[in-house]
Structures are given as structure tokens and as C-alpha cells.
């Protein structure tokens, strides 16, 4: 099965590609001249300027930061995928903030739910999700069996991952999110956008995050981006065979 792996920035894509090298072969595909060119000579550029790397069964996309950019980039790549060699799975991947103590710096989180944590409306009684407002969905659920296998293979925490448009930077906001989502493992900025695009194309979605910082008061000196990127590469080294062998939703 081919999978599209969507990252926000080049450093994340490079880590995923590093983890997937040497390539996990597509089980039903014999590489031809075009495939070899893509595997051996860096990324291609899609319409819209999106960079995409091919590694065996996987295409790794740099879509941009935030849910809107992630949705636009993902939708572009999915629309351009040629049938019958299209994608069977979409994965949102990158670094993010971890909710202490469950997800410490350097650990991985695999989403069992992808949650739009700040898409909705504020009211005197509290926050209302878009689902509660009647305007759509606020949660996407990855295939449970695949998410569990991914977490087991990588040693990741299996927990909800929150998508936010503004990274949490205060204790008050941390407490608010933790109260609304007590089981959350991580927050990031792209997962829900990727999931919306995947759903529009009828495809399942997974999210994998490597923790670079604790969700809480903003402290750049405490961030460990390099450590998180290494964890992301290590995670995809273990995850590649799981994704390549997955047969789709049962």
C-alpha cells in the first residue's frame, strides 16, 4: 500500500525520509526509470510549490505550517496521485508539544484521535466545538488496529493529539486544554487539516508526533528540537514496515 506522509517543514520531512531509508519496497510495484529518479535524486515539486520525496512505498510531503496549509498541501498531493497507483493511507507526522508527564521530551505519540482543539466558538458557558455548533466534525479517528500496531512498533504513547492554530504558551491555556481533553498526549498544528483532506478523498489517516517540548508556558530554551527530530527518524525506521504491510481498514 502506498502512503502519503505529510509534514509541515523540511526538517521534519528530512527526518522521516532518513528513517525510511533504505526504502521499504512497495509490495506490488517494480521500480521503473521515473521511480528510480525520484528515489535517488531528491524531491519533486508539485503545483503550488510543495516538495515531495519518494521512498519506496511512501511519498513524504512538505505542506506548510498550520491546519489550513496542511489541508491544502495534502489535498493537492491526493488530487494529483494517479489511479490506480494512488494512496491507501495518509499520515500526519512531525514534532509537537507533549502533555506532561505522559509524553516527555524525546518520546513519540501516536494519535488514537485527531482533535480540532480550538475550532469552534467561545461562550459564557465555555468552549463549543464545531460539532456542537452543528457545522461539521471536530474529531477524526485513525484505524484503531493500525494506530495500536504503530504505537507498539515505535514504543509510542497511544493518545489523542490536539490540533491547534496557536501553540500553547501559558499555564492557563494548558490547564484549559487539559480539562477539556484529559487524555491528550500531544498538541501540534497540522493533524486535523491533514485528516480533513484525507477524509474528503475517502482515505484513512494516522498521526505521529515526536515531542520537542512540554505543553505549557513558552520557554524556547527548554525545547529539544534536535532530539525530537532524531526520535521522529527512529520512529519511522520502526514504523515503515508496519505501514507498508497494512492491508487497509478491516
Question: Predicted regions span which residues?
Answer:
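His/Asp/Glu-rich mid-to-C-terminal helical/loop segments that flank catalytic regions of hydrolases
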Residues: 215-250
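N-terminal short beta-loop-beta anion/metal-coordinating cradle
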Residues: 1-73, 80
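A C-terminal functional module that forms or caps the active site or interfaces directly
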Residues: 166-207, 212-218
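Structural motif
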Residues: 2-4, 88-91
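Mid-sequence, gly/pro-rich, charge-dense loop/helix-turn segments that line enzyme active sites
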Residues: 99-181
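Glycine-rich phosphate-binding loop signature in dinucleotide/nucleotide-binding domains
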Residues: 80-88, 201-203
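Hydrophobic/aromatic beta-strand patches that form the interior of the parallel beta-sheet core
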Residues: 61, 91, 109, 157-162, ...
